[in-house]
């Protein structure tokens, strides 16, 4: 009877809480491991760098005693390591053994709740390996309700902002801005600005020497790993890409079309992202295009345009996120601001997005990592994760930012690749003419043309309303549009190529225009049948003009 009472007392007082084991493969090395794998299914192994420290993090919800033990071994005699936790430091002789030995390190009084860290460092080494660590064992009254990551995935939790669209809104453009504060850009960070049901668009830190702007669109179907298994009718097709942009397929996290542009973005400046959607109900596909605004030159750049099959939808399921995509440095703090979100309806009207909802990936939802946050500062939403700081938000929390009331002004005609694309267009046109596919006899203001039939009326003027028959096609001969009956339009509302070319023709005449992309739609995706940067060919018969 006395034993039962004693056990009950111990449990209630916290002294009877079972010891907790932190697996050795859940720690972090500083500096982070590069070549040889440190953290394996057997714990910490191949720790050979005496300047490298190892850290294990945990969260205590109670004060009291903390007893620390470590299960470790080494192949070398005489090795010693320093172990510190909660302001106390211990010098530990590493057992020389071929099997792991559980060694008691010492006791630490815990006066405050919060995150704590066990730090291991080399003190004396006599061989190559400092120590192999199978696990860290914690006991004592303070560990009741302890939290730590017990899984080998060491990434910080991914954090998201979800933006709700108004009912019946047909979003054709999604605009967002990202600002990363100083120190908020560790390696292996992906700050994603414009996410939607079929893809995502943002910026990454890929290595010490490379950063990227990345735009990806998922294939149709359910294949998660191998894109070679995706049928052609389910594959995303590249329509166009910007200069020096790499475009290829991807797998292992779903499959799809990937594009990236190497660009040394920095903390401090605000970066602007724009995604457009051009749905085609006839083919049940949507063309998604990503544009990035380069602040140094104050111009937009086309990243890539992809045609997504089995779609036909407008932009929906809009979101942003911050991701730590490799776990070697998952202990580091990441933060970004997301501001000035706008969407454009199919009728051309812009709407500002003022509300967001916070969500987490499985790492956060399962409680493996609890260091994350979100909110509003200076009129912008923010996300942070990592750093083993206390969370200031929970799943599903909503936020509202103040309105800016100024929709984005976007000029895609003046873009960073204009001169390069102009040279490419000239070559394409020259090759087409040289091969005899097209004939042109004249050139004016960047436009190539040929009078196919002389008219008997006056010359067309830009201010005219024109009645005309026309056929439009790409350089490869593929027709994208043609009139069945004479069409009537105000010339000054059409593309620049028509405004330059039609005044060269008389009423009753017929003209062929070969229009470089800069005088056509440039990098814009304006038709499912016209990729960005397309050279356009038009045969136009001027029937009549009106003032």
What spans do the regions from the language model cover?
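Bacterial Sec-dependent N-terminal signal peptides
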Residues: 1-21
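Short, glycine/serine-rich, charged loops/turns that create anion-binding
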Residues: 11, 75, 519
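Extracytoplasmic
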Residues: 20-264, 274-279, 283-413
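Short coil/turn motifs at beta-sheet boundaries
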Residues: 169, 266, 283, 461-463, ...
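Short, amphipathic alpha-helical segments
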Residues: 263-267, 423
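Detector for glycine-centered tight turns/loop "hinges" at secondary-structure junctions
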Residues: 268, 297-298, 348, 446, ...
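Short Pro-Gly-centered flexible turn/kink motifs
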Residues: 269-273
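Cross-family detector of peptidyl-prolyl cis-trans isomerase
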Residues: 410-547
């Amino acid at each position: 009877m006395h034993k039962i009472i004693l056990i009950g007392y111990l449990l209630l007082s916290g002294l009877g809480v079972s010891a907790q084991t932190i697996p050795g493969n859940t720690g972090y090395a500083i500096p982070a491991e590069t070549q040889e794998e440190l953290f394996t299914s057997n714990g910490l192994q191949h720790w050979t760098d005496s300047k490298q420290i190892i850290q294990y993090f945990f969260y205590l919800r109670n004060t009291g005693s903390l007893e620390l033990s470590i299960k470790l071994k080494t192949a070398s005699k005489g090795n010693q390591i320093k172990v510190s936790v909660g302001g106390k430091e211990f010098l530990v002789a590493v057992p020389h053994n071929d099997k792991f030995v559980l060694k008691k390190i010492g006791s630490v009084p815990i006066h405050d709740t919060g995150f704590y860290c066990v730090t291991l460092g080399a003190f004396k080494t006599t061989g190559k390996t400092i120590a192999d660590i199978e696990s860290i064992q914690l006991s004592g009254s303070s560990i009741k309700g302890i939290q730590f990551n017990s899984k080998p995935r060491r990434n910080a939790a991914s954090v998201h902002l979800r933006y709700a669209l108004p009912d019946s809104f047909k979003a054709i453009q999604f605009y967002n801005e990202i600002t990363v504060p100083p120190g908020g850009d560790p390696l292996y960070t992906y700050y994603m600005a414009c996410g939607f049901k079929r893809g995502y668009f943002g910026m990454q830190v890929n290595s010490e020497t490379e950063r990227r702007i990345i735009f990806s669109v998922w294939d149709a179907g359910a294949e998660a790993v191998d894109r070679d298994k995706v049928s052609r009718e389910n594959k995303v097709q590249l329509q166009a890409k910007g200069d020096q942009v790499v475009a290829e397929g991807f797998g292992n996290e779903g499959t799809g079309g990937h594009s990236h542009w190497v660009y040394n973005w920095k903390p401090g400046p605000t970066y602007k992202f724009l995604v457009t959607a051009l749905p085609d109900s006839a083919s049940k596909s949507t063309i998604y295009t990503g544009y990035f605004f380069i602040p140094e030159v104050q111009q937009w750049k086309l990243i890539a345009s992809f045609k997504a099959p089995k779609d036909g939808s407008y932009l929906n399921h809009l979101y942003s996120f911050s991701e730590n995509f490799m776990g070697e440095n998952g202990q580091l703090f990441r933060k970004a601001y997301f501001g000035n979100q706008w969407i454009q309806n199919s009728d051309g009207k812009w709407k500002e997005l003022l509300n967001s909802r916070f969500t987490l990936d499985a790492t956060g939802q399962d409680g493996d990592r609890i260091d994350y946050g979100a909110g509003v500062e200076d009129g912008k939403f923010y996300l942070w994760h990592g750093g083993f700081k206390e969370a200031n938000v929970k799943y599903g929390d909503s936020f509202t930012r103040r309105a800016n009331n100024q929709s984005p002004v976007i000029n895609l005609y003046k873009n960073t690749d204009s001169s390069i694309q102009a040279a490419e267009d000239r070559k394409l046109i020259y090759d087409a003419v040289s091969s005899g596919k097209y004939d042109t006899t004249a050139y004016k203001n960047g436009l190539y043309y040929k009078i196919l039939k002389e008219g008997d009326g006056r010359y067309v003027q830009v201010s005219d309303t024109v009645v005309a028959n026309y056929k439009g096609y790409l350089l490869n001969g593929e027709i994208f549009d043609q009139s069945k009956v004479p069409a009537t339009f105000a010339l000054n509302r059409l593309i620049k190529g028509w405004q330059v070319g039609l005044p060269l023709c008389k009423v009753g005449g017929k003209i062929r225009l070969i229009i470089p992309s800069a005088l056509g739609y440039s990098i814009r995706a304006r038709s499912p049948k016209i990729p960005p940067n397309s050279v356009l060919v038009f045969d136009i018969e001027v029937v009549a003009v009106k003032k």
